[in-house]
């Protein structure tokens, strides 16, 4: 941000306040895109900062929406349903029915559990509406479903008349500073997707992968070589057996660098060696 504009804001706006530099944000998105292979497309996790959604709409293919509240925000902003990934561990009947009633059903719904599968199967049957879904594969934590559950769903996929199963979602956490951890996860998911094709004849159209890129917050972390880190991950993606559509879900990694928080000192004192 230009210093003159910064000074103007400080003089005219009461602290505390946030400023989001949209030029910096757009450059960040362009940079991340340039570092990834062509089959990788970005999905912005709205929870990271919902205020910038409309500003980046032309540059982002998908939005991850993990609550009914976020969906209402996206709806008010005029976000196309075709760009929505309806995620989240909690999906209740009232909110899911409202979402199904409001759009043309071009969204993608994630399935975190067998209960969520049965809920959406029930609602779509009643409404005779076909929706797209992806199945979340657990990383071993409380989120998603185990391999056996996903395999069972796919073995019986013909009975889900109104659920178009497009693929797999995988996300294990965030702030992963070692590229080898993400590479290991990509290898695991790649092998699982290949097994689904070979053993069940199920071809994944959509792989949604949350890498959990780290955000540098403190001075001691400034030596993090992000370019090399991203190149190593991109190289792994290029050499995967799966070469279909990959949606890379990112939140803080996209938006963190564009924000500044302004406040003021209201008191000053010294205790021993600390101010």
Regions found by a protein language model. Name each.
Residues 3-16:
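Generic N-terminal amphipathic, Lys/Arg-enriched alpha-helix
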Residues 184-275:
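C-terminal active-site-proximal or functional interface alpha/beta core segments in diverse enzymes
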Residues 28-36:
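A short, N-terminal amphipathic alpha-helix
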Residues 9-11, 167-174, 210-215:
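A short small-residue
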Residues 40-206, 236, 266-269:
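Active-site-proximal beta-alpha core segment in soluble small-molecule metabolic enzymes
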Residues 13-22, 42-44:
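A glycine-/small-polar-enriched, mobile loop at the entrance of the PLP active site in fold-type I
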């Amino acid at each position: 941000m230009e210093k003159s504009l910064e000074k103007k804001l400080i003089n005219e706006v009461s602290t505390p306040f946030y400023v989001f530099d949209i030029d910096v944000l757009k450059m960040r998105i362009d940079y991340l895109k340039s570092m990834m292979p062509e089959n990788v497309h970005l999905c912005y996790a709205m929870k990271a900062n919902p205020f910038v959604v409309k500003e980046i709409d032309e540059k982002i293919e998908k939005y991850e929406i993990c609550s009914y509240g976020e969906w209402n925000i996206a709806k008010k902003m005029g976000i196309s349903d075709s760009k929505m990934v309806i995620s989240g561990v909690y999906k209740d009947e009232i909110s899911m029915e409202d979402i199904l009633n409001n759009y043309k059903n071009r969204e993608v719904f994630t399935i975190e559990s067998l209960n969520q599968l049965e809920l959406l199967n029930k609602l779509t049957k009643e409404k005779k509406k076909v929706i797209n879904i992806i199945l979340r594969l657990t990383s071993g934590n409380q989120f998603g479903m185990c391999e056996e559950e996903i395999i069972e769903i796919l073995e019986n996929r013909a009975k889900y008349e109104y659920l178009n199963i497009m693929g797999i979602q995988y996300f294990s956490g965030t702030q992963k500073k070692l590229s080898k951890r993400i590479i290991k996860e990509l290898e695991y998911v790649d092998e699982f997707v290949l097994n689904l094709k070979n053993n069940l004849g199920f071809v994944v159209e959509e792989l949604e992968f949350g890498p959990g890129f780290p955000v540098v917050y403190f001075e001691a972390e400034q030596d993090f070589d992000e370019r090399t880190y991203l190149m190593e991950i991109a190289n792994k993606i290029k050499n995967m057996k799966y070469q279909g559509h990959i949606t890379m879900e990112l939140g803080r990694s996209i938006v963190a660098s564009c924000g500044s928080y302004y406040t003021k000192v209201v008191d000053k004192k010294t205790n021993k060696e600390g101010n």
